[in-house]
């Protein structure tokens, strides 16, 4: 099974591990939002951020950790970029993760048609990552968009195959860890062949899917501490 990949992580100093609070910020769309209370940015919702935070705290009891979830349901890459200063840079996180992109594809076919090209997705994502690098010292974890098998989403699956290489290349350039969720789910479905086990619609994870993402998120987090 393919493992979560560390990219070009530089180690945290001993001081940052032991003498200060480490702020971890989750960013993305509905998969990250997961029903969080938007009046309280410490509310992690009921999706993978909640389970990932629990695993990270369990695995790293020596760290003083603060978790923030600012995912917003329905967001495309352009919308995430537009709000990224108040919902990202302003918090000056030590670790920031991003899971975005599936809505850019979905809106090509949904009732509110928005034609976002692959080139626009790449540019929006690049601008977000450049902003993180220029205006924070945060470690970056990128999680790829994914789509589990669903008969009504064949066009989306075809489009995703051209978006995934874009995200992968941006991760190589900017990220400290990359989580190839689409590949990881594909591998998992070889032994658990029912996509409904992880998601009722191929996109939004149920509890099993959220825990699956969280497990690989926690591995990525551990890799950037080395």
Language-model segments: which ranges?
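Alpha-helical cap/lid subdomain in secreted, periplasmic
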Residues: 8, 18, 51-66, 79-226
């Amino acid at each position: 099974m393919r493992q979560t990949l560390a990219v070009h992580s530089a180690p945290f100093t001993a001081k940052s591990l032991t003498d200060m609070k480490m702020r971890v910020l989750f960013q993305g769309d509905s998969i990250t939002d997961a029903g969080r209370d938007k009046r309280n940015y410490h509310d992690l919702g009921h999706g993978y951020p909640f389970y990932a935070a629990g695993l990270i705290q369990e695995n790293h009891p020596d760290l003083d950790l603060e978790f923030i979830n600012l995912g917003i349901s329905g967001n495309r890459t352009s919308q995430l970029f537009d709000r990224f200063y108040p919902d990202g840079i302003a918090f000056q996180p030590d670790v920031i993760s991003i899971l975005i992109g599936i809505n850019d594809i979905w809106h090509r076919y949904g009732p509110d048609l928005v034609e976002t090209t692959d080139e626009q997705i790449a540019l929006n994502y690049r601008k977000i990552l450049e902003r993180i690098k220029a205006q924070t010292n945060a470690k970056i974890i990128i999680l790829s968009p994914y789509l589990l098998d669903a008969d009504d989403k064949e066009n989306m699956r075809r489009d995703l195959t051209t978006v995934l290489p874009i995200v992968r290349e941006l991760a190589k350039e900017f990220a400290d860890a990359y989580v190839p969720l689409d590949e990881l789910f594909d591998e998992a479905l070889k032994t658990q062949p029912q996509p409904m086990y992880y998601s009722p619609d191929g996109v939004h994870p149920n509890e099993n899917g959220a825990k699956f993402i969280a497990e690989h998120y926690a591995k990525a987090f551990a890799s950037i501490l080395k």
